[in-house]
Amino acid sequence: MKVTYFLEVTSSWCFWSEPMWAELKARYAGRVAFDWEIAKMLPGDWPVSRAQCDWFYRRSGTIVRSPFMLNSGWFEPVKPGTYPAASYVAEAAKDFGFTGDEIRLALSHAGEREGQKIGRLEVAVAIAAQAGGKKLPAKKLRAAAESKAVAARIDASTQEFFAHQISQRPAFVLSDDIGDKAVFSGLVHLEPLTAAIDAMLADVAAYTSFKSHHGNPPAR
């Protein structure tokens, strides 16, 4: 079984979902494969001002009962034809073996807690390189973040996100070997996902048990 997490590094709702994501990975370690992919936001999805960003942060922070408010200091208007760098840098870090959460979490924390300008390539690269240490050289990381290969991967994962007929991040797509699929878009609470994962694992186990007793279905 696999769970794919679609995210945007600068998304506040993705920030709030991280404790739940960490709990899922710990609870189902060894039984479920976990992966994350970038789902780019559309131009109209971004806040248009820092004041508007703060309003969104007050809303999401209140909903999740956070004891702190996120920092909008990272905000800069997204210019036409450009995209904030943080997600590209996080994706590029995968090329250096950082396929876990550590680099994108460092970027998210720097932006949404410290207010650093993670939309700027040089800032995002510096933060990621510090988080990755000697295994993540800044010059090579920057080249990868600007590469056509990374852009193509992000475009492909974004297309996959929209192919599920969803628009809200975070999104979680659950799939298993017997063809079941569950899609959650915009939820940050643990319980709906654990209920679905438990049900799907139980079904897979039942199919496995049946096959051990009866084999494959007759050809005719």
Set out the residue ranges of the language-model regions.
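Short, cysteine/histidine-rich loop/knuckle motifs that typically chelate Zn2+
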Residues: 13
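Extreme N-terminal starter segment of soluble prokaryotic enzymes
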Residues: 1-4
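C-terminal cap of thioredoxin/glutaredoxin-like
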Residues: 6, 10, 18-26, 109-220
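Structural alpha/beta surface segment adjacent to cysteine/selenocysteine redox centers
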Residues: 16-114, 211-217
